[in-house]
C-alpha cells in the first residue's frame, strides 16, 4: 500500500455512516442507569437499561421536529397532537398537525421544501439566529441523520390544499421523485414521517428493536408529553394525558419501606418552564431529569446545575437557622431525598454537541419565592434524621490529640512529626510563598530535599505522606482519628478542625504543593488530599486559588538521535503522542518516568530550578462541592457507575493541558481522577472474553512466551515477568497473583494455568497458607496451550507499553475462562462476583451454542461448581444458588461431616464448630480433616439440631452463591451484567468463532506461500538438473536475473532460500523429497479448505475435555486417598448426589454426556425401580463405593426419554429429599424408621 492510498475523502453520507458517534452519539448498546416507567407499578423506577444512544437520537430528531412545529403553529393554525406509532417490526411513525411545511419549490435550489428539509444535509429554517427562537434544531442535520441511518424513510406533508409524498432508501442515497397532489383546502395540515432504522447498523442482532429500547422510547415520549401538556401526545393511539406538570412529577414519588407515601412534590411553573423537587422517604444518589425545549439532556447541564443551586441555597439557609440552636443539617444527605425535574423553554439553547446530551448556554430559571421552598423543606419528615448535634466536642478532642491550633516551635514540631523537614525561615519574606511540599513516600521526599536549593529551603518544607490516606468526606472525624498521615499534615500546616479559614495568612504555610508520581495512584493521592481539604475547610480553598497546587514532572523524556542529541521532556502522553505524529520518521530513545524515584538528583534540580513553571494552581468554587461529593461520598455509587460506564476503559493517558497554569475541580475529576478510576477498575474487573485481569494476563503472556518445561522459583519468576511485561507495581503483588493462578485445591482454580510445585495453599485457609514465594516453584500447566493455542498468537491485538509490544488487550481462549474459574473484584464504583462453573459443563455449553442454542438457553442450565466438591448445589430464590456440604446423621446425636461449601475454609468451619462447643450445642469434636478434605465427627447435645434445616444452618453447611457480574466488554467498556451470564457466553462465542475464521484464512495463506516456495524451488532444481543453469560460471547478478525470468517467488525480497542451498539439495533423493513435500502441502491445503471454523473448535474442545477428565480423575482420587477408609457406620446421608449435568449438547461422536454423583444401598432396590425413584426404607452404605464426578456417556437414544433441560427431571435421592422436605420433620421421629 502506498502512502497516498491511505488518504480518503468521504461523502457526507458515508462520513455519517462511518463515524456516526460524531453526529448521534455511540451506536454501541450500553447498560445505562436511568428512570423508566413501570406500567405494573404505575410510576417511574430506576433501572439499568441497555440503551443505544445513537438509535435513541435518530428517533429523537423526528420527535423534536414535531415539537418544534408547536412554536411555528401560531395564529389560526394551532397544533393539537403528536402521534407516535412503533410497530412490532420496529418501524416508527411520527405524525403531527399544525402549520406544516410549505409545499413549494425553492427558486434557489430548484426543489420542493420537504425534499430539502428531509433529504439534504445542512438545510434548516433555524439559521437566522432569531433571538426569540425556542426550537431545538440548530445545525441543519436533524431528520437527515435519521434518513441516513434508516433502511427506508418516507414523508407525507399536507398544507394549504396540497399534499406531497416522497421516500428514500439506501441511507438517503436513493430518492423517489416528489409526488404532489391537490387536496381539499379544508383538510387539516399534517406531517407524517415513517422510517425503519437500520437496526443491523446499530448492532441489534435480530435487525429489530429491543424490548429495552421500546421502554426507553416510551419514557422519552412521556417526557415530551409532560413538556407540552397543552397538546395531546399519544403512543400507539394511547394518549398520556398529563393535565398538569404535577401529574407527571407524582410518577417519581417512591413509597417508603413501610409502604407509606412521601409528601407531594414541590412544583413551580412559569411561562418559561417548570421545576419540581420530588421528595423520597429513603436516600438515593442525586438524580436529575433535565429537558430543554423538548430535548432530554441525559448528561445534565447548566439548567440542572441551576436547579440544584436553588435547592442548595435553601438548604444552606435552613442549616444556618439550625446552627443558631447548636445543631447542624447534613445538607448532602437531605439532597439525596430529592429527585429534581427541570423542564425549561429557552431561547437559542446551545448544547455541547449534535447529540445534545448537555446544555452549555446560560439559562433563565423560573423565579420562585425562596421562602416558599424553605418552608416546604422544613416540613419534610426525613429532615430530623439529618439534624445532628455539632461535632465541636469531637473536633476539640481530636485537636487536643494532634496538637492543632497551637503555635508550636520548629523544634517542638519536628519532635512531634519526625518525617517533617520544616522550612528554615519562620516567616515569608514577601517575595516567596511559604510552601509545604508533600510527597508520595520517602523516595520522593529525598528527591525534593536533594533538589531544593539552600535559598528555597528557607521557605519550602517537605513532608512525606506514608500509608493510605483515608476518605474523610462528610467531616467523618471519627475516621480521621485513625489516619496519622492526615493528622500530621494538618499539624504541620497549623490547621485546626472545626475552624473556618478565609485566608492562609494565619497558617504556618501559605501554600500546599502536592508532588506525586504521574501515574494513576498519584492521581488518587491528589484526589484524597483535595477531598480532605474541601470537606473540612471549603472556604480556605474557595477564597484562595492556588492554596493547593500540583507539581508536574515529566512522564516521558526522549533523546533525539543525530548531531543535536536534543532532549525533550513531555508532561503528558497526549503531548508525546502529538509529537510522534508530527515526526513520524524521527529516531529517538525514550525514558518513561512512572514514578518520582526514576528521576535523578540532576533532573530534580532541573525541576526546581524554575519551580513556578512546573506548578498548576487549583481553583475551587462552591459548586465543586457537589462534584467532589459524587466522587468520594460512599452513597453516590450510582453516580460513579454512570461516570465509569461513559468512560473509555482503556484510556491510557491523563488528558490535562499541562501548559495551563490553573486547574479547575471539574478538569481534575474528569481528566485525571477518572484515570485512577479507570485503572483501578481495569485492575479489579476481569475481561469478559478471557476472564483475566491485567496482572494475570501479563503473567500468562510471559509464561507462554517463555516456552520452558522446567519450573522456576516464584520469587525469581516475578522479576522476569515484571521486566518482560513492563509491570510497574510491586513484585510482591505479582508473586501473590502467580501463587493464586497455580492453586488447584477445591475452591481455588477449576483450571490452574500454572503448576503448583510446593506448598501453594490449601482448603485449610483457602490458599492463604501458602509458603513464601522464595520456596515454591511453578511453570506453565498443560492447560496453557490447550486453552490458548499458539496459532492464535499472531492474530491478537497487543498492548504498547513504553514503546514495546507486551501482552494482548485480551486473549480469546477456547472456553470462556471467566465461567471456568470465576472472578471476584472491587473497583471504583463497580464490583464483580462471579462463581466458578465446572469446565466440562462450560465446554458442553459452548458445544450447545455451536449446535444452535442461544446463550440465554444454555446459561440457564449452568450450576456453580468447584472441581472436587462432593456436596450439592441447589437453586435458591432470585437467581441465587446454595452450596450444601455432605453430612451423615447417626443415633444419639452423632454427626459425620465429610464436605463443606468450597467458599468456606476448613479453619473458619473449625472455628464455627468450636463456637458451638462453647455454647454447649456441640459436646465433642473429632477432627480428622486434612489439607484438602473434610472429615469431622461431632456429638451434639440431646435436643439440638432436630431438623435438616437446622443442621445446614447451625452447622454452617449451606452457603449462598450470588452472581453480581461486572465485566469489561470486548470493546473495553465496563458492562454491568448483574446475574445474567449469557452476555459472557455470547461475547466469547462471537470472538472465538471470528478468530477461527481468521486463523483458518491466515493458515491457508501461509501454506499457499509455502507451496509457492516449494514449487519455485522445484522449478529451479529441474532447470539445474537439466543443465539449463550454469551454476558454476554464473555471477550473483546472473542467477538473480535467471530466477526473475523463471518467475520464481521471493522470500523476504530475495532468492536466498534457493541460491544458498547446499549442493546435496540438487540430488535425485532431495528432488523426490521435494516433490513429496509439494504433494503433502497441496493435500493439507485442500484438507484445511474442507475444515470449517466450527470443526476446528470442536477438535480443540475434544482435546481439552479428554485432558481435563484425566486431570479431574487424578485430583479426586488424591482427595479420596486422604479420607479415612471407615468412620462411624450407619446413618442417613444428605445429600447423596449432585444434581445431574443438564444436557447441553452433543459431542463430536454424537453422544450426550451427563455427570451424576452415584449412591449405592445396602439392600438391593426393587427390580422394577428406575433410577431416581423412591427407595423405601433402604439406607445408604457408608462403606459402599461412591463415584464423584463420574462421567456417564451413552448414545442419544439411551437418553431420549430424559429431559435434562428441565429442572423437574433432576436425579435425587428420594430418601434424603423426603426427609429434607417433610414439614417440620424431626430427626427424633424419623431416625427409628431408617436406622437399625
Swiss-Prot record:
Listed cofactors: Mg(2+); Mn(2+); Ca(2+)
Residue ranges annotated for the Topo IIA-type catalytic domain, each copy included: 685-1101
Residues where ATP binds: 65, 96, 124-126, 137-144, 354-356
Domain annotation Toprim: ranges: 434-548
Residues under site feature: Important for DNA bending: 826
Subcellular location: Nucleus
Co-factor binding details: Binds two Mg(2+) per subunit. The magnesium ions form salt bridges with both the protein and the DNA. Can also accept other divalent metal cations, such as Mn(2+) or Ca(2+).
Keywords: ATP-binding, DNA-binding, Isomerase, Magnesium, Metal-binding, Nucleotide-binding, Nucleus, Topoisomerase
Marked site (Interaction with DNA) residue numbers: 468, 471, 640-641, 693, 733
Molecular function, one GO term: ATP binding
GO biological process annotation, one example: DNA topological change
Any one annotated GO CC term: nucleus
Annotated spans, Interaction with DNA: 956-965
E.C. no: 5.6.2.2
Note: Eukaryotic topoisomerase I and II can relax both negative and positive supercoils, whereas prokaryotic enzymes relax only negative supercoils.
Quaternary data: Homodimer.
Name assigned to this protein: DNA topoisomerase 2
Organism: Leishmania chagasi
Lineage: Eukaryota, Discoba, Euglenozoa, Kinetoplastea, Metakinetoplastina
Amino acid at each position: 500500500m502506498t502512502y497516498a492510498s491511505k488518504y480518503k475523502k468521504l461523502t457526507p453520507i458515508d462520513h455519517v455512516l462511518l463515524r456516526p458517534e460524531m453526529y448521534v452519539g455511540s451506536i454501541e448498546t450500553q447498560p445505562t442507569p436511568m428512570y423508566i416507567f413501570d406500567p405494573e407499578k404505575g410510576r417511574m423506577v430506576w433501572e439499568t437499561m441497555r440503551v443505544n444512544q445513537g438509535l435513541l437520537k435518530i428517533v429523537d430528531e423526528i420527535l423534536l421536529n414535531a415539537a418544534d412545529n408547536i412554536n411555528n403553529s401560531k395564529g389560526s393554525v394551532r397544533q393539537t397532537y403528536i402521534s407516535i406509532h412503533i410497530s412490532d417490526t420496529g418501524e416508527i411513525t411520527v405524525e403531527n398537525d399544525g402549520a406544516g411545511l410549505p409545499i413549494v419549490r425553492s427558486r434557489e435550489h430548484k426543489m420542493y421544501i420537504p425534499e430539502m428539509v428531509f433529504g439534504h444535509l445542512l438545510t434548516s429554517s433555524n439559521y437566522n439566529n432569531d433571538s426569540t427562537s425556542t426550537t431545538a434544531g440548530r445545525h441543519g442535520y436533524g431528520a437527515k441523520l435519521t434518513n441516513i441511518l434508516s433502511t427506508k424513510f418516507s414523508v407525507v406533508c399536507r398544507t394549504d390544499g396540497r399534499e406531497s409524498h416522497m421516500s428514500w432508501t439506501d441511507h438517503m442515497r436513493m430518492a423517489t421523485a416528489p409526488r404532489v397532489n391537490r387536496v381539499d383546502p379544508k383538510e387539516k395540515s399534517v406531517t407524517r414521517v415513517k422510517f425503519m432504522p437500520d437496526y443491523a447498523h446499530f448492532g441489534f442482532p435480530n435487525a429489530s428493536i429491543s424490548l429495552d429500547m421500546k421502554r426507553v422510547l416510551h419514557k422519552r415520549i412521556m417526557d415530551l408529553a409532560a413538556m407540552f401538556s397543552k397538546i395531546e401526545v399519544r403512543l400507539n393511539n394511547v394518549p398520556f394525558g398529563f393535565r398538569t406538570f404535577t401529574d407527571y412529577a407524582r410518577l417519581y414519588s417512591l413509597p417508603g419501606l413501610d409502604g407509606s407515601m412521601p409528601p407531594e412534590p414541590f412544583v413551580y411553573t412559569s411561562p418559561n418552564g417548570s421545576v419540581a423537587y420530588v421528595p423520597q422517604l429513603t436516600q438515593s444518589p442525586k438524580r436529575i431529569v433535565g429537558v430543554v425545549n423538548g430535548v432530554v439532556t441525559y448528561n445534565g447541564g447548566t439548567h440542572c446545575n441551576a436547579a440544584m443551586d436553588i435547592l442548595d441555597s435553601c438548604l444552606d439557609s435552613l442549616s444556618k437557622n439550625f446552627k443558631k440552636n447548636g445543631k447542624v443539617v447534613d445538607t448532602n444527605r437531605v439532597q439525596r431525598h430529592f429527585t429534581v425535574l427541570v423542564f425549561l423553554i429557552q431561547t437559542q439553547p446551545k448544547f455541547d454537541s449534535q447529540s445534545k446530551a448537555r446544555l452549555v448556554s446560560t439559562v433563565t430559571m423560573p423565579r420562585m419565592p425562596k421562602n416558599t421552598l424553605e418552608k416546604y423543606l422544613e416540613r419534610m419528615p426525613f429532615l430530623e434524621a439529618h439534624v445532628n448535634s455539632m461535632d465541636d466536642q469531637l473536633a476539640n478532642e481530636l485537636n487536643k490529640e494532634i496538637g492543632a491550633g497551637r503555635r508550636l516551635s520548629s523544634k517542638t514540631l519536628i519532635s512531634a512529626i519526625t518525617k517533617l523537614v520544616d522550612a528554615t525561615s519562620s516567616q515569608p519574606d514577601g517575595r516567596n510563598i511559604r510552601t509545604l511540599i508533600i510527597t508520595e513516600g520517602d523516595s520522593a521526599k529525598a528527591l525534593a530535599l536533594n533538589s531544593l536549593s539552600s535559598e528555597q529551603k528557607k521557605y519550602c518544607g517537605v513532608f512525606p505522606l506514608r500509608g493510605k490516606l483515608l476518605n474523610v468526606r462528610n467531616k467523618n472525624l471519627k475516621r480521621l482519628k485513625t489516619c496519622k498521615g492526615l493528622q500530621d499534615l494538618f499539624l504541620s500546616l497549623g490547621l485546626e478542625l472545626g475552624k473556618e479559614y478565609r485566608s492562609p495568612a494565619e497558617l504556618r504555610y501559605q501554600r500546599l504543593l502536592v508532588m506525586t508520581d504521574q501515574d494513576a495512584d498519584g492521581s488518587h493521592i491528589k484526589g484524597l488530599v483535595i477531598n480532605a481539604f474541601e470537606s473540612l475547610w471549603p472556604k480556605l480553598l474557595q477564597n484562595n486559588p492556588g492554596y493547593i497546587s500540583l507539581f508536574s514532572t515529566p512522564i516521558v523524556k526522549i533523546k533525539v538521535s543525530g548531531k543535536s542529541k536534543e532532549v525533550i521532556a513531555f508532561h503528558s502522553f497526549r503531548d508525546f503522542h502529538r509529537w510522534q505524529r508530527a515526526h513520524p520518521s524521527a529516531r529517538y530513545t525514550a525514558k518513561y518516568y512512572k514514578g518520582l524515584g526514576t528521576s535523578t538528583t540532576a533532573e530534580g534540580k532541573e525541576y526546581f530550578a524554575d519551580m513556578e513553571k512546573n506548578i498548576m494552581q487549583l481553583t475551587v468554587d462552591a459548586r465543586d462541592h457537589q462534584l467532589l461529593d459524587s466522587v468520594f461520598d460512599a452513597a453516590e455509587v450510582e453516580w460513579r457507575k454512570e461516570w465509569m460506564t461513559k468512560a473509555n476503559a482503556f484510556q491510557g493517558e491523563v488528558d490535562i493541558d499541562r501548559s495551563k497554569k490553573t486547574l479547575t475541580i471539574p478538569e481534575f475529576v474528569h481528566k485525571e481522577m477518572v484515570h485512577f478510576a479507570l485503572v483501578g477498575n481495569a485492575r479489579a474487573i476481569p475481561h469478559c472474553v478471557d476472564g483475566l485481569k491485567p496482572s494475570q494476563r501479563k503473567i500468562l503472556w510471559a509464561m507462554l512466551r517463555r516456552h520452558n518445561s522446567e519450573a522456576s522459583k516464584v520469587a525469581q519468576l516475578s522479576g522476569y515477568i515484571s521486566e518482560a511485561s513492563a509491570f510497574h507495581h510491586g513484585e510482591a503483588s505479582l508473586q501473590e497473583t502467580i501463587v493464586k493462578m497455580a492453586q488447584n485445591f477445591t475452591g481455588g482454580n477449576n483450571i490452574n494455568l500454572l503448576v503448583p510445585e510446593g506448598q501453594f495453599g490449601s482448603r485449610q485457609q483457602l490458599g492463604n497458607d501458602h509458603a513464601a514465594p522464595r520456596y515454591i516453584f511453578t511453570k506453565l500447566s498443560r492447560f496453557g496451550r490447550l486453552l490458548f493455542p499458539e496459532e492464535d498468537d499472531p492474530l491478537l491485538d497487543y498492548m504498547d507499553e513504553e514503546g514495546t509490544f507486551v501482552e494482548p488487550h485480551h486473549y480469546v481462549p477456547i472456553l470462556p475462562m471467566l465461567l471456568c474459574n470465576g472472578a471476584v473484584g472491587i473497583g471504583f464504583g463497580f464490583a464483580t462476583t462471579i462463581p466458578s462453573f465446572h469446565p466440562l459443563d462450560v465446554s458442553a455449553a459452548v458445544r450447545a451454542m455451536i449446535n444452535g442454542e442461544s446463550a440465554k438457553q444454555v446459561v440457564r442450565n449452568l450450576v456453580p461448581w468447584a472441581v472436587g466438591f462432593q456436596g450439592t448445589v441447589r437453586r435458591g430464590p432470585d437467581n441465587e444458588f446454595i452450596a450444601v456440604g455432605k453430612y451423615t446423621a447417626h443415633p444419639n446425636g452423632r454427626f459425620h461431616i465429610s464436605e463443606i461449601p468450597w467458599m468456606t475454609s476448613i479453619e473458619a468451619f473449625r472455628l464455627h464448630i468450636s463456637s458451638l462447643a462453647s455454647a454447649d450445642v456441640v459436646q465433642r469434636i473429632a477432627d480428622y480433616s486434612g489439607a484438602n478434605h473434610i472429615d469431622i465427627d461431632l456429638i451434639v447435645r440431646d435436643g439440638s439440631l432436630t431438623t435438616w434445616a437446622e443442621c445446614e444452618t447451625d452447622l454452617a453447611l449451606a452457603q449462598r452463591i450470588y452472581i453480581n457480574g461486572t465485566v469489561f466488554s470486548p470493546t473495553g467498556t465496563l458492562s454491568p451484567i448483574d446475574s445474567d451470564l449469557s452476555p459472557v457466553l455470547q461475547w466469547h462465542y462471537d470472538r472465538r468463532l471470528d478468530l477461527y475464521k481468521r486463523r483458518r484464512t491466515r493458515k491457508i495463506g501461509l501454506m499457499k506461500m509455502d507451496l509457492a516456495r516449494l514449487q519455485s524451488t522445484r522449478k529451479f532444481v529441474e532447470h539445474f538438473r537439466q543443465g539449463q543453469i550454469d551454476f558454476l560460471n554464473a555471477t550473483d547478478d546472473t542467477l538473480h536475473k535467471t530466477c526473475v525470468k523463471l518467475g520464481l517467488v521471493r522470500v523476504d525480497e530475495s532468492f536466498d532460500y534457493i541460491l544458498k542451498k547446499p549442493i546435496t539439495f540438487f540430488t535425485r533423493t532431495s528432488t523426490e523429497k521435494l516433490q513429496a513435500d509439494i504433494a503433502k502441502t497441496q493435500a493439507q491445503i485442500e484438507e484445511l479448505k474442507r475444515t470449517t471454523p466450527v470443526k476446528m473448535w470442536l477438535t480443540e474442545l475434544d482435546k481439552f475435555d479428554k485432558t481435563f477428565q484425566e486431570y479431574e480423575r487424578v485430583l479426586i482420587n488424591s482427595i479420596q486417598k486422604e479420607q479415612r477408609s471407615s468412620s462411624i457406620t450407619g446413618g442417613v446421608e444428605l445429600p447423596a448426589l449432585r444434581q445431574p449435568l443438564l444436557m447441553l449438547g452433543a459431542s463430536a461422536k454424537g453422544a450426550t454426556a451427563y455427570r451424576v454423583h452415584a449412591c449405592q444401598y445396602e439392600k438391593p432396590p426393587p427390580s422394577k425401580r428406575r433410577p431416581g425413584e423412591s427407595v423405601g426404607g433402604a439406607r445408604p452404605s457408608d462403606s459402599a463405593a461412591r463415584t464423584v464426578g463420574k462421567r456417564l456417556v451413552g448414545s442419544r437414544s439411551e437418553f431420549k426419554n430424559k429431559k435434562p433441560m428441565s429442572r423437574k427431571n433432576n436425579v435425587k435421592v428420594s430418601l434424603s429429599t423426603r426427609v429434607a422436605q417433610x414439614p417440620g420433620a424431626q430427626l427424633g421421629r424419623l431416625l427409628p424408621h431408617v436406622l437399625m
